[in-house]
């Protein structure tokens, strides 16, 4: 995580996403699972963010290059599962199938929240992914303030297209941050401490020159080529932008 902050790319959450994804699919592959159930769905995730906002966390060539330039520890036990192993080996050789249960039933986010609250006493968090304190800081402060984009635009666009939010409602939410300036400052100090940066070091990184995934080695060409071929033969319908 420190290496990704130092690299100046916007998607500093890549290490945690890569670790979680890789650990799960490594375990599934080791035990020869044929089905993996996920919460992914078209109802709230039909709009994909630009790759300049969120690059492929499973491009291990990219992650390893950033770590090589800025990392301070060896990655002996850090779980890594490359996108090609996931897309080719898991799906076509081992026969693993990804099941998105929420796409099999009518799924309306607001109705789901009401049901979870009434049945289980669940307390909703402010915004998508804000169950993670790091992600809350990253999406509410780091990317808007440093890199100039708000990931809520993609989230709300999905809900607009599926009739769960109006454009006016989305614009009203986008017009103001989810956290106050005081809360953001507290989170800035908290994350800096957790990552063992001094406030001055973290501030220097924040003010540094922004970079893109294109500034580091990557498999973008091969990934997008594979996606285009999959689209042509009907195996995939994702569109990258």
What kind of feature is each model-predicted range?
Residues 1-241:
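Nucleotide-activated chemistry modules centered on ATP-dependent adenylation/adenylyltransferase
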């Amino acid at each position: 995580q420190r290496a990704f902050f130092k690299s100046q790319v916007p998607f500093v959450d890549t290490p945690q996403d890569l670790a979680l994804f890789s650990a799960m699919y490594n375990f599934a592959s080791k035990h020869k699972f044929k089905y993996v159930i996920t919460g992914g769905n078209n109802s709230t995730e039909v709009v994909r963010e630009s790759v300049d906002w969120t690059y492929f966390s499973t491009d291990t060539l990219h992650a390893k290059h950033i770590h090589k330039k800025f990392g301070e520890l060896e990655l002996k036990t850090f779980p890594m599962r490359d996108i090609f192993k996931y897309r080719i080996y898991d799906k076509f050789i081992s026969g693993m199938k990804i099941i998105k249960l929420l796409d099999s039933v009518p799924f309306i986010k607001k109705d789901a929240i009401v049901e979870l609250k009434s049945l289980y006493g669940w307390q909703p968090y402010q915004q998508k992914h804000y169950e993670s304190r790091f992600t809350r800081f990253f999406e509410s402060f780091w990317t808007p303030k440093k890199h100039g984009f708000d990931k809520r635009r993609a989230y709300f666009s999905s809900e607009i297209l599926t009739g769960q939010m109006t454009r006016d409602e989305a614009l009203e939410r986008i017009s103001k941050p989810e956290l106050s300036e005081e809360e953001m400052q507290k989170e800035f100090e908290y994350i800096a401490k957790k990552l063992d940066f001094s406030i001055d070091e973290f501030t220097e990184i924040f003010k540094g020159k922004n970079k893109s995934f294109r500034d580091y080695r990557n498999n973008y060409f091969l990934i997008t080529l594979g996606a285009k071929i999959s689209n042509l033969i009907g195996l995939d319908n994702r569109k990258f932008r």
